[in-house]
Amino acid sequence: MKFAKIPMATIIRLSIYMRTLQELLEDDVDVISSERLAKQCGVNPAQIRKDLAYFGEFGVRGVGYRVNELVNQIKEILGLNRPWNLAMVGLGNLGSALIRHGNFIKHGYMFTAAFDVDPQKVGKRLPNGLVINHVDELEDVIKEREVHVGIITTPASEAQSVANQLVLAGINGILNFAPVQIQVPDCCHVENVDFTIKLDSIAYHLSFGS
């Protein structure tokens, strides 16, 4: 499914809508109005209708959205109607915690490779059954296990080198937790995660917000 360029804020909200709808499914909710969905997602109903309108017509006027149907439609829009294989590079405290987090599998993301340079970690088996490979093996393992997305949790000094290796291995999507901006070709999409930036926003609102 191909669409024109969509604002990133819309894509992020679609993820929020989908997770909220999945929670509603667990509560046996079959149909929901845009007003109720908006309230639970922290947006206004017009925003939901606008976001969905980028991709077609959804729901029934005066009735609302069929929850299961809308979940499946959003999954298709986001490309989540298929599994995605992940590789973790850097098994320090953060990387180890993330790779153990069950929420990834719940949403269709599966770790199929893990890498580190520490000889005390390389060769060890993780709770999910993965054996930690040395970073020197990255390209071969990435291709063998058909990894789609690389996650970097290395120190900043190593992040660019790891990004280069991931790109050479054919990876076009990187989630970067290292506290540094990495440079990649245009064909590779990078999402940077820096918790301190979120804290800066909170600090601002606590200091000057109403």
UniProtKB/Swiss-Prot annotation:
InterPro entries: CoA-bd (IPR003781), NAD(P)-bd_dom_sf (IPR036291), Rex_DNA-bd_C_dom (IPR009718), Tscrpt_rep_Rex (IPR022876), WH-like_DNA-bd_sf (IPR036388), WH_DNA-bd_sf (IPR036390). GO terms for biological process: negative regulation of DNA-templated transcription; response to redox state. GO terms for molecular function: DNA binding; DNA-binding transcription factor activity. It is found in: Cytoplasm. PANTHER family: REDOX-SENSING TRANSCRIPTIONAL REPRESSOR REX (PTHR35786), REDOX-SENSING TRANSCRIPTIONAL REPRESSOR REX 1 (PTHR35786:SF1). Homodimer. Belongs to the transcriptional regulatory Rex family. This is Redox-sensing transcriptional repressor Rex. It comes from Syntrophobacter fumaroxidans (strain DSM 10017 / MPOB). The lineage of its organism: Bacteria, Pseudomonadati, Thermodesulfobacteriota, Syntrophobacteria, Syntrophobacterales. The gene is rex.
